[in-house]
Amino acid sequence: MDFQCRTCSQAYDAEQMMKHLSSTRHKTVFDTSNDEDICCEECQDKNIHQLQIIRFGGEDMVLLCNSCFRKEYSETERPSTSYSLQNGSILKFWEKYVKVRECCCDECGEESNLNANRNGEVLCDKCLPKSNRAKDFVSEKSGRFLYIYLGLNETQNSTRKPRKKGGRRVGRGKKGRKGAKIKKEKKETFEAKISRIAYEVKKENSTIQSSSSSNLRNFKGFKAVESDPVVAAKVSKSETSRSNPGPSNRNKGKGNKANHKKNSGNGIGKEKERKTNIRNNVRNSQPIPEDRKNTNSHVTTNSGGKGKNESVDKHQLPQPKALNGNGSGSTNTTGLKKGKKDHAGQKTKGNDKTGNKNPREAKLNSAGRKNALGKKSNNQPNKGTSRWTIGSDTESSREPSISPNENTTSITKSRNRNKKASKPTLNEKSKTTTMPKKLETKNQEKNNGKTKDGKLIYEEGEPLTRYNTFKSTLSYPDLNTYLNDYSFALFLEQKLENEFVQNFNILWPRNEKDTAFIINVEKNNNSELEKLLPANLLALGRPAFNERQPFFFCTQDEQKVWYIFIKELSIQRGKYVLLVELFSWNNLSLPTKNGSSQFKLLPTSAQTSRILFAMTRITNPKFIDLLLGQKPIKEIYFDNRLKFSSDKLNRSQKTAVEHVLNNSITILQGPPGTGKTSTIEEIIIQVIERFHAFPILCVAASNIAIDNIAEKIMENRPQIKILRILSKKKEQQYSDDHPLGEICLHNIVYKNLSPDMQVVANKTRRGEMISKSEDTKFYKEKNRVTNKVVSQSQIIFTTNIAAGGRELKVIKECPVVIMDEATQSSEASTLVPLSLPGIRNFVFVGDEKQLSSFSNIPQLETSLFERVLSNGTYKNPLMLDTQYRMHPKISEFPIKKIYNGELKDGVTDEQKAWPGVQHPLFFYQCDLGPESRVRSTQRDIVGFTYENKHECVEIVKIIQILMLDKKVPLEEIGVITPYSAQRDLLSDILTKNVVINPKQISMQQEYDEIELFNAAGSQGTAGSLQNNVINIINGLHVATVDSFQGHEKSFIIFSCVRNNTENKIGFLRDKRRLNVALTRAKHGLIVVGNKNVLRKGDPLWKDYITYLEEQEVIFTDLTAY
């Protein structure tokens, strides 16, 4: 007999269903064989936890809830035999109960005065005399009826048990029982139908497929035991051999005398065999009691899943001393105290005899004691993985020896070029930017890339020295290799931002093939957990963990990493009990012979969590081929004879629209000002009108790119249902007064909330405390409104990472996805929209000749757009070939030198001329003031950036000329510079200037949070020197080049900053950064800098200075302008 859980729709047999209900606390069960819900005969209560089947000796069986049972029977009248979920028998006896309930005469159907024999035959008193075997039947009045009818064992005192009031209950069977069949459902309303479908779709879209059948109730394991130095060496040797490629070596090492006992679970010392489950494990490991919390798990189980293959971790490379999130007073990630020198790959002496009582402290305080996981493996990495040359952060190190991979194609990116500027941490509450401290000594950093106090040196726009060379992989042999590679890159990034969790205990699985294990974490007075949640959420009792939450699980030296997620959790005796499972792409098996102190947990940011979840949802074969980069992408060219909505589209734009309609994957190159927004608008209109397919999802890495498209659609197509979804941090910037305010989801939801819930919403916006009941009611009503609005939208605009939020889980399928600024989207973040359900067409729109995203981990900078073009799987990418933004004098050099003449002007000099401006392209020679170095310190990283006060003074003069002489509004002027320090210095000077800011209005900041790595508020990362901030002074925009990508202004002033005797220009050498800087202006571009330094700093700059000299637009004073 099969049963189905009404809450999660999972179907099991009786035994498995009872385990499921006990662990999840789901309440309602459906009997699929009899087509009915299990409920109380009296009140129809369906809560399985309150129900029990009661047997009155051999007389009758009834199904009652606890409340009805207490009402009907007193203590002395209550029978001793009952079957409930608590004693694990209610579903086992359900079939017998149904048999008794349905019992009637086989001849006439009478339900009363019955008699039964051991063959299961039933006759009433009237029909019994007609049978020739009447003597074999027993009457229901004898008290032995059920023993004979059901074949139960009859005990000696069975007749002494309490008798049921009124005898056996009738009227429950086929002739109309009172509460057996489920009540007739009321007709489902439209609102209820939407809610039901939304819930089912959300649950499906939130599921992580599981390969383990373990849950908290049935888990059988043993406590991870710390090893002594002698045994640790043996385990280390065993683990090393286990990690070698080839047949599984899991059972090797069991021949050790210390471990020679059969089925010794932990494999360390003389531990006895532990035949336990989670309820009777070692007492001090906090066993799981029965009263579990309702976890409502959405992790489906494939009980036939196979164990993981034994293979070497491709990332087992000798690592330098890594940053630790515990601050300056913490131990580093290799387990050495700060101040100790750690030579990569070098063995140091040490043992456990340190005098520390805590084994974890003994390990962390040992001077480089070898991790019990074993020696560093010299195995080569798996095929298809990215290769790293890791720069040393210590005085002495060695490079890892890695053999080239013959089956993959690689390109090498120089980390001294093509690098975006890093981002400073932004305090959202502050209206002004804090100026970094001046550098006290010029040569302070010349100490092997460190300051005197041992902090890492980082120059803005340059990579950390440990990742100075990176070889990216253009193709992968299989999806698991691909996912493993990017998971490790995410781990490297996250450990620069987040702090490790060290205090926990592990229960390893006894089954070698199981991929799940248990982690116990103290709930109370745990400072590590207090850092994971804001104070207001802690006050509401929100747990620090949640189901499906991913983590990085690694050894103390970070040489081995496992990627895990929480399958199920509960809170037991003041501890979080986490049943975690390996993601399916893990290469390493569980290290079940090692103690808890040898590992640490790294929490992930919300962005990284969504990426890892997206990795579990990539199932579309076409997209898998796209990611692996081995098969050519099919391209179909067909003239659809479309009727375009606009007659202003050029030929390249029309071709692009037709290509999208004919192909599942489209790569569209869109140089600056070529009408990408107009092309995307036409694609959306054609998809809706021709295919009636919606919702169409439009995503990008930045909000500005999304807003440009949304504003155009909103203005030109008011009849289309448009929705703009923002991250929580951005919602306050998009009020009703914003141009897009009326289509923003949070504003629409607020207007549709009840008055009481609007009050609660206002409290949460102000950061005020609310009660738990208010929080619950608000969450339910907000979800209901959100589901309805999202389900009815035709076009949804959001960022890549926000596309993985809970709002879009309600969408059953998303037929068309358009990604704008695809080169600014890291490949990791691209996986989020790529993994959405039901995608038929995916459109990448970008320009590989402009800046990509920035990350401290080089692999996370490359976009999927770039990699697809580099590996040659997309043979003929389309390109929009006509620019309409820039004055031809401004666009001439980028067209020739950067776009190789493939781009052309769609405007004339006359169309882009500004009254009174004779030189639309103007270079102002500014060589009198040298650059200054500025330092910003965060945690263990010292970042350097640059400013030039003399250039700032001259730029103020230029702005005044544009304002007063050329009549250019401040809103049409933008000042851009490569360096954040120059941006901040300029902003400070302009804010105090009485001509430019006569009313002394405070500076405003417009920021677009970096949705993936180095987000605003992250501390201690090199990339946090500069985020996507635009300072606005009385309408005038001041920004870095990187943050101004995607923007345009009538006039742009470009401050180059660099002026030194060494002719060094840093990341100004980046061809893409120069391209962005030169292509932001529509009517006039003014470049301020020292032509001599720029000319000698880079070949491309030399060409540009030569071009400017040929055009005779280099001036030493401003009178010519």
Swiss-Prot record:
One of its GO terms (molecular function) is DNA helicase activity. Residues 278-287, 376-413 have a biased composition (Polar residues). It is an enzyme of class 3 (hydrolase). ATP binds at G670, P671, P672, G673, T674, G675, K676, T677. GO terms for biological process: nuclear-transcribed mRNA catabolic process, nonsense-mediated decay; regulation of translational termination. Its main location: cytoplasm. It is found in: Cytoplasm. InterPro entries: DNA2/NAM7-like, DNA2/NAM7-like_C, DNA2/NAM7_AAA_11, P-loop_NTPase, SF1_C_Upf1. Gene3D superfamilies: P-loop containing nucleotide triphosphate hydrolases. Disruption phenotype: Sensitivity to drugs that affect translation fidelity. Overexpression results in a nonsense suppression phenotype. Residues 160-184, 251-263 have a biased composition (Basic residues). Keywords: ATP-binding, Cytoplasm, DNA-binding, Helicase, Hydrolase, Nucleotide-binding, Phosphoprotein, RNA-binding. Probable RNA helicase, which may be involved in modulation of the translation termination process. Probably unwinds double-stranded RNA. In vitro, unwinds covalently closed, circular DNA in the presence of a DNA topoisomerase TOP1 and replication factor-A protein RFA1. This is Putative ATP-dependent RNA helicase ECM32.
